[in-house]
Amino acid sequence: MNDIWWQTYGEGNCHLVLLHGWGLNAEVWHCIREELGSHFTLHLVDLPGYGRSSGFGAMTLEEMTAQVAKNAPDQAIWLGWSLGGLVASQMALTHPERVQALVTVASSPCFSAREGWPGIKPEILGGFQQQLSDDFQRTVERFLALQTLGTETARQDARTLKSVVLAQPMPDVEVLNGGLEILKTVDLREALKNVNMPFLRLYGYLDGLVPRKMVPLLDTLWPHSTSQIMAKAAHAPFISHPAAFCQALMTLKSSL
């Protein structure tokens, strides 16, 4: 089995694993790497099949998490953005002793809309899967544009995300399809009731993929977790609001 691409950066005494979202790679953290690297030892990861972690096919959430866990430090804060939030959450469920704190960013335990649950309509996710086989590049670009919609720096933020994708080899259609399948089918709402490490959830008020309506529902479901909504951010708050984003992580670190 191939190894996944993994880079450590910074010299802080606290380890922080950063997991990117669908279609992207670890370069997405470039704009906050310097700032965070002075406080943490960062573990920058390309998820299996993405970026420089080539040679992997489509995986289930459990398989993806097991692959990432192999390279991970014994103890770290695990931060996952969007799809990466599901991987970080799965890590907290399967290896709680290795997760000092769990941070999910613009992520949902159940991305797909269900009865009484806000999310992305399953037919939209299905549509993305269909379009992937028709026009691969265009579909990924549309998904990226959705992520920054509404922010004051939307155009610039979308360009940043696009440059991250283009900087590395594109994932295979099979891998992207597998990622959408995870977003469409996984539901960790009940399972995450049982995690007992510090748990911080960060959201963008303008996020079109992870609706803020779910925040109070999860506050009730997971009273042990803390939520923070960033007022002018959308789906990529670390790109549009890097200072506030880093501050939230420093505050978490000082509370551990």
Curated annotation (Swiss-Prot):
Name of the protein in question: Pimeloyl-[acyl-carrier protein] methyl ester esterase
Organism: Salmonella agona (strain SL483)
EC number of this enzyme: 3.1.1.85
Main location: cytoplasm
Lineage: Bacteria, Pseudomonadati, Pseudomonadota, Gammaproteobacteria, Enterobacterales
One Pfam entry name: Abhydrolase_1
GO molecular function, one term: pimelyl-[acyl-carrier protein] methyl ester esterase activity
NCBIfam families: bioH, PRK10349.1
Any GO BP: biotin biosynthetic process
Binding-site positions, substrate: 22, 82-83, 143-147, 235
InterPro entries from the UniProt entry: AB_hydrolase_1, AB_hydrolase_fold, BioH, Carboxylesterase_BioH
Top-level taxonomic group: Bacteria
Homology family: Belongs to the AB hydrolase superfamily. Carboxylesterase BioH family.
Pathway, per record: Cofactor biosynthesis; biotin biosynthesis
Catalytic activity: 6-carboxyhexanoyl-[ACP] methyl ester + H2O = 6-carboxyhexanoyl-[ACP] + methanol + H(+)
Gene Ontology cellular component list: cytoplasm
